[in-house]
């Protein structure tokens, strides 16, 4: 499946919630009619079946983290093999993606922008350049912006935006050095309450 390259707000309208695909901290409902489905007249949201609700939740989370269908299914399989709660394991695996960590540290305005920084070899992990967005960051790993990329205007703009967002408690960042440490795996209470990961578990358990 190819990565979606169309209007970002359309995806948020389709899911009926902000997927944080656009930069900035302005509420998305001030940018578009989030409660109205995409389309010229805004298709009516019909009553979904249980399967439909589960599918929508999976699509919402998959798009939020910018993960393709096959990748997402593989993350679920890995989460199911791990000890503990499968849904929480899934969210932790998604949070460990390097592109997500770069975004969480405030070095990029969106996960898509973070993915681009990583792909363009602008990110270093434990002193080594890593250009794989799905690279798994582990506790105590140090992530930084490569020296020659530190003067990029978009990174400075992203840091300013990050100051207006709630800072992740599982990450420590030195904005002066453009360096951060992934201190621990996030607990479920650290993450968005708008995600219902149990619906995803139910979907894949069929």
From Swiss-Prot:
Tell me which Pfam families the record gives: Ribosomal_S4, S4
Keywords for the protein's UniProt record, in alphabetical order: Ribonucleoprotein, Ribosomal protein, RNA-binding, rRNA-binding
User: Which PROSITE patterns does the annotation name?
Assistant: RIBOSOMAL_S4 (PS00632), S4 (PS50889)
State which residue ranges cross the membrane. Answer: none
The superkingdom listed in its UniProt entry is Bacteria
* GO CC term, one of those recorded: small ribosomal subunit
Task: Name a GO molecular-function annotation.
Answer: rRNA binding
Q: Name one GO biological process term.
A: ribosomal small subunit biogenesis
Question: SMART domains, from UniProt?
Answer: Ribosomal_S4 (SM01390), S4 (SM00363)
Q: Which residues form the S4 RNA-binding domain?
A: 96-157
The family this protein is said to belong to: Belongs to the universal ribosomal protein uS4 family.
Q: How does this protein assemble? A: Part of the 30S ribosomal subunit. Contacts protein S5. The interaction surface between S4 and S5 is involved in control of translational fidelity.
Its job: One of the primary rRNA binding proteins, it binds directly to 16S rRNA where it nucleates assembly of the body of the 30S subunit.
Name of this chain's protein: Small ribosomal subunit protein uS4
């Amino acid at each position: 499946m190819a990565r979606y390259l169309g209007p970002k707000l359309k995806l948020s309208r389709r899911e009926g919630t902000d997927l944080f695909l656009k930069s900035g901290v302005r509420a998305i409902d001030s940018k578009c009619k989030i409660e109205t489905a995409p389309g010229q007249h805004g298709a009516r949201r019909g009553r979904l079946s249980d399967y439909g609700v589960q599918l929508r939740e999976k699509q919402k989370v998959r798009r939020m983290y910018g993960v393709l269908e096959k990748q997402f299914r593989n993350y679920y399989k890995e989460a199911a093999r791990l000890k503990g709660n499968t849904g929480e394991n899934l969210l932790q695996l998604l949070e460990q993606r390097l592109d997500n960590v770069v975004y969480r540290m405030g070095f990029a305005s969106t996960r898509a922008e973070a993915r681009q920084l990583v792909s363009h070899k602008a990110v270093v992990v434990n002193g080594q350049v890593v250009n794989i967005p799905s690279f798994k960051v582990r506790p105590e790993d140090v992530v930084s912006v490569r020296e020659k990329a530190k003067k990029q205007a978009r990174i400075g703009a992203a840091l300013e935006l990050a100051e207006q967002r709630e800072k992740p408690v599982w990450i420590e960042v030195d904005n002066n050095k453009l360096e951060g440490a992934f201190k621990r795996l996030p607990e479920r209470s650290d993450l968005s309450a708008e995600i219902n990961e149990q619906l995803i578990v139910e979907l894949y358990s069929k």
